[in-house]
A protein has these predicted regions:
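Flexible, compositionally biased loop and terminal segments
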Residues: 1-253
């Protein structure tokens, strides 16, 4: 074992020790950013970058499960990404489909697809649905795969569902408007039956949410990591957890 590996192991153990008895986020959202820039920095194609990034996911989920995280939401494809050049988008969709299938085949985690699959090619949407259906119905760690996902789009879809439900009950728009509460919208979000994310991590150094879970993250803690997603290490994750543990969550109080 090299000296670097020894030092890395020592540092990882110190980080783990610093989390002993400290709060661990129940739900972690992750914006998997930087695949293309990572690839460009070492002379790889964008497709190669996406494949390496997809390969990181299983490893990351193992880290999350190890520390007791219950839910992970992975943002793999935004609605904005759908406007990319057709050849890159086709390759990216295929990589995502293969990655989700591989996650399902491990039999370790319950998978849920969150996003508007109507925006995707039918073969990709069908593959994603099948992978989710074939994953375990229950697991210690549940994984949300956000594909064709945008926070504004999610809220619009939730409002539409609220209006449809009201119409089916014979309510007028005026009656709906007079009694509408934020909880009515929240329960129609893709993750309406899950707790909101406690911690949102974004890799690549970008310090914005770009629409990720904008309703659910109202009281989330944010951690922005300079590392591109393919290079994201266990110590980077543990640092994010340490930063979370050191913060005082006031929840608006």
């Amino acid at each position: 074992m090299s000296q670097w590996n020894v030092l890395y192991d020592v540092y990882e153990k110190r980080l783990r020790a610093s989390l002993a008895g400290r709060p661990i986020p129940r739900h972690v959202g992750v914006i998997l950013d930087g695949n293309r820039r990572w690839a460009k920095s070492i002379g790889f194609t964008a497709s190669q970058g996406h494949r390496v990034g997809a390969g990181k996911i299983t490893e990351f989920l193992g880290w999350a499960e190890e520390v007791g995280v219950e839910i992970v939401t992975l943002w793999m494809l935004s609605t904005d990404n759908l406007s990319r050049q057709s050849d890159e988008l086709s390759e990216l969709l295929a990589i995502i489909s293969q990655a989700v299938s591989a996650l399902s085949q491990t039999g370790k985690w319950h998978l849920r697809i969150v996003g508007d699959l109507r925006l995707l090619p039918e073969d990709i949407a069908s593959s994603l649905r099948q992978s989710a259906q074939e994953s375990p119905s229950k697991s210690a760690l549940s994984v949300n795969i956000a594909v064709g996902y945008g926070g504004r789009h999610e809220i619009v879809e939730a409002v539409r569902e609220v209006i449809r439900d009201a119409g089916q009950r014979g309510e007028s728009l005026e009656e709906l408007a007079s009694r509408l509460k934020d909880s009515d919208i929240a329960e129609h979000l893709y993750t309406g039956d899950q707790p909101d994310p406690d911690l949102v991590i974004r890799t690549s150094g970008e310090q914005r949410l770009s629409g990720f879970m904008i309703w659910q993250s109202a009281h989330s803690e944010f951690y922005f990591c300079e590392t591109y997603w393919p290079d994201f290490r266990k110590i980077d994750f543990l640092r994010a957890l340490r930063a979370y543990a050191q913060r005082e969550r006031r929840m608006g109080k």
